[in-house]
Amino acid sequence: MKQANKMVIYQVFPRWFGNMKSSLVKNGSKVENGVGKFSDFTPVALSKIKELGTTHIWYTGVIEHATNTDQIRRDHAAVVKGNAGSPYAIKDYYDIDPDLADNVPDRMKEFESLVRRTHEAGMKVIIDFVPNHVARQYYSDAKMAYVQDLGQKDNTSKAFDPNNNFYYIPGQTLCL
């Protein structure tokens, strides 16, 4: 009887993969705490991961999320975990975390290059798609013109409306 091929998934946070800083500073900057990059996944690194028997790499935290780093528009500090933020507070489903790129304007090209290198190393790619986990300040700077931001057309005068993307407390300002 022929044995079915087994999928072996290697999950990795690119932010941590190539980061050589071992002593972290609470709420530290990227200089203090470091940050991994897509480019850290070199052909040699990918071949070593493949040698583990890996068939798929799950790149976690790739989609742009709320952050207080200086690459793009910052989010309110009270709603961001530390400075780097949580990869589960998605700010733009159409974009890539700029902190993971060597050259921010080319971040999508750098991600596409990572996908190509991974495929060339004989593995498939998985990334997180985190529906219903969005940042309080969701804003897309990479969406197509016909796409509206989440909450853009919400009726904020109602606590709940089936056509809204978010819940609201009418008449009260969010105080953080």
Where in this protein do the model-derived segments appear?
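N-terminal structural segment of carbohydrate-active enzymes
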Residues: 1-124, 132-143, 148-157, 162, ...
